[in-house]
UniProtKB/Swiss-Prot annotation:
Keyword Membrane: no
SUPFAM superfamilies cross-referenced by the UniProt entry: Ribosomal proteins S24e, L23 and L15e
Entry's family note: Belongs to the universal ribosomal protein uL23 family.
Name assigned to this protein: Large ribosomal subunit protein uL23cz/uL23cy
The organism of origin for this protein: Pelargonium hortorum
HAMAP family for this protein: Ribosomal_uL23_B (MF_01369_B)
Length: 89
């Protein structure tokens, strides 16, 4: 699981769990197919859609820092990630 940094727990991500969508911060150099295969292999689920966006970097004296992007992963109906649901509840 080199590419996935951690699961995101925000108000929006909590609302998306009811729609069977989970939010993760991932390495910016990882591809969509790598992230999809890691999620399917590690959690044992089927991914049907993935949306991603880069978060704005923080301003520093010597430039920007941006080391990750956010992925919203939609699972097939009937699948869920129980470890994240237990974390949220």
């Amino acid at each position: 699981m080199d590419g996935i940094k951690y699961a995101v727990v925000t108000d929006k991500s909590l609302r998306l769990v009811s729609k069977n969508q989970y939010t993760f911060n991932v390495e910016s150099g990882s591809t969509r197919t790598e992230i999809k295969s890691w999620v399917e292999l590690f959690f044992g689920v089927k991914v049907i859609a993935m949306n991603s966006h880069r978060l704005p970097g923080k301003r520093r004296r010597m430039g920007h820092t941006m080391h990750y992007r956010r992925m919203i992963i939609t699972l097939q109906p009937g699948y869920s990630i129980p470890s994240l649901i237990n974390l949220i509840i």
